[in-house]
From Swiss-Prot:
Family (UniProt): Belongs to the TRAFAC class TrmE-Era-EngA-EngB-Septin-like GTPase superfamily. EngA (Der) GTPase family.
Official protein name in the record: GTPase Der
Keyword terms, alphabetized: GTP-binding, Nucleotide-binding, Repeat, Ribosome biogenesis
Species of provenance: Prochlorococcus marinus (strain MIT 9215)
Name of the gene encoding the protein in the UniProt record: der
GO BP annotation list: ribosome biogenesis
Protein's job: GTPase that plays an essential role in the late steps of ribosome biogenesis.
Pfam families hit by this protein: KH_dom-like (PF14714), MMR_HSR1 (PF01926)
Amino acid sequence: MILPTIAIIGRPNVGKSTLVNRLCQSNDAIVFDKPGVTRDRTYQNASWGGKEFQIVDTGGLVFDDDSEFLPEIRTQVFLALEEASLALLVVDGNQGVTDGDLSIAKWLRNSSCKTIVAVNKCESTTLGISLASEFWKLGLGEPNPVSAIHGSGTGDLLDLVIGELPENNIRDDEEKIMMSIIGRPNVGKSSLLNSICGEKRAIVSDISGTTTDSIDTLIKKGDNYWKIIDTAGIRRKKNVKYGTEFFGINRAFKSIDRSDVCVLVIDAVDGVTDQDQKLAGRIEEQGRACIIVVNKWDLVEKNSSTIYQVEKELRSKLYFLHWSKMIFISALTGQRVDNIFEHALNAVNQHRRRVTTSVVNEVLKESISWKSPPTKRSGKQGRLYYGTQVKNKPPTFTLFVNDPKLFGITYRRYIEKQIRLNLGFEGTPLILLWRGKQQRALNKEVERENIEVIQKD
């Protein structure tokens, strides 16, 4: 479903993100008592009175200051208003009307977007009415007192909001594919997001840490809707101070956890760092599908063999993700960026894939014929009775054996490699569970499930 959009607009530190969290009943927007925490525009879904919509949180809008990221934030706010069905101007009731509020109100009056004024920080109902009355001078209609922290007045505000929203007239019942863009600071994640979307959705800067939140973007490619999450860069813990970056990194880790597929971005010039390896380990631990994107490939001097040498070197350090597809791109020029969706979709499909027990056992039987299970010094040999896939996301197989201790790491890796060679599963981790089974219990299960035993005692 393509939802109507509400753009949250206002000066820095008037409580926009707190109000977003209140209206969406979530904590996804980073809230910190410091101006400029929100920089890019971020999206969350919400519903009220049986009507669904999405809210876009924007950075603090300042017209008369071009320092730091303020010009880029202005661009993000302008883009948010262009796509919005409704603007919600948030002001600070305790501070009263400021020159900044008047400038924003003038800009909104000149736009074609309907605007509702929310007077925040009105903790008392009686006092709130008095505080809100001053904001009639903005010329945007009746001001509405609310408290984002305590929730008072937000129900009435939402009633007004849904009354102004258009009907949802575009529907798509297909499931959205969640794809997170993961990487160290300044490897080009936001540039990649902008290249993918064909517009400036995230602020791009040479300064590390430009993205402090996780940015959700919904786009359609082919027959699929993709929800793309650009995350904050993840640095060493000792370099992370408590505050916006701390919260942003937590959001980034949560983005991995809720993703169908992760795009791990590596800097082609810098190569793989310790932090890249930790991110790779995190993706593997969470069992997520993944593709490795080597960005800034346009900056590398190369000949006909460079790509093979670089891939070999990178894979030797990203051994956690030996099963991931690796592609070399330039987010700046757009080189091979479109290939990301093809490989990401394949990884998602493999991550969700199921294989019948008969096919699994055909592969195991052939694998054993090429290389028998090891024999211990005591003369006891491992026996692999049969295997079956027990779940997907990621694909998980249970292999029933006489004694798991008889199967060392080398043979276990051999079996996983054979499963991949014969069945694919590129782009997704595999989990193999080795389970010991007594002969009596095995016979009952084999008879009940009509399974052919690969090896007998």
